[in-house]
Amino acid sequence: CLPAGPLRELIRPALKSAQFVVIIGDDLHHITKKYDYDNLEFYNANIKAVDVLDKKRYFAFSGIGNNDGFFDTLMNKGYDVKKKKSFPDHYQFTRKDLESLLDKAKIENLSLITTEKDYVRIPEDYRKNIDCFKIKLEIPNVEKLIRKLIN
C-alpha cells in the first residue's frame, strides 16, 4: 500500500514490495491493468463526506500532500468553493496565517473550510470560525482487506 501523488514513492518499485493496493475513486491511471503482479490484490474505495455542511460559499484551505485533490473533492461533493489557498504538506498554521485567512473570508463573505488533518493542528480558539471537512473511506469487501492485513 502506498500513497500516490506528488512527492510520493514511485509506483513500480513500491508495487513490487506491496501486498495490496487501495485505489481511491476511479482507476484513472489504469493501475490494475498496467501493474498486474501476482502478489498484488486490488481494492477500490470511495471518499464519503461524514457530515454534509450547510450550503455556504467557501474559502477552502489546506496543508496536505495534494491540496488540489482536497479542493476537487469539495467541489465534487457539491461544496461551493469560491476561493482556495494551498499551504505545504504538514504546515503548522500560525496565528498570523489564520487571522489573514479569517480577514479574507470575512471581506468576501465566505466561510472557511479545511481538512480534518489540518483542523486538528489549528489552535482551538480559531476552530469555532472554521468548518472541518470530515471524510471516511468506503471499501467494498473491507472484511477481505482486513483479513489480508491481519495475516
Provide a role label for each language-model segment.
Residues 53-95, 147:
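Redox- and metal-dependent alpha/beta enzyme cores, enriched for Fe-S-associated oxidoreductases
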Residues 27-34, 68-69, 119-123:
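Short, charged/polar "capping" segments at the starts of alpha-helices
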Residues 11-17, 36-37, 53, 106, ...:
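Short, conserved loop/helix-junction motifs that constitute active-site signature segments
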Residues 88-91, 128-151:
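Short, flexible loop segments at boundaries between secondary-structure elements
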Residues 18, 63, 112:
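Residue-level signal for inorganic ion chemistry
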Residues 1-35:
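Phosphate/Mg2+-binding loops and adjacent switch elements
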Residues 15-25, 39-59, 81-86, 133:
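Conserved beta-strand/loop subsegment of P-loop NTPase cores
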